[in-house]
């Protein structure tokens, strides 16, 4: 599903900083992967590339057998929306929307009807043990509950 071959990334802020050097990685569908390393080792840069939030300089990145290079913003957003999930270290919920509405929001951008969005969001919340919190606002939830909703 994800294949990186010889990925390189350099930031040019005055002196060039080569943060990723020859990264090779294969992740199959259904695998759970952790990216670990020392501070400043390039973890966030790698994750930003995997999430199609940043470009790489050289190498090849294939997502579902599609080369991820020089995509239009529209195409990149489509792939992010349909094929990539994020769990951010810091997260944000929309404060004036309840748990169902926050969970359903990405489905809106996929053109799914409100009825189906809400049904799917309730199903996801149930899987996370949060069905009883579906209509609670973020300020009524614990930090852990908010993390799961996000």
Region spans (language model):
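ABC family nucleotide-binding domain
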Residues: 1-150
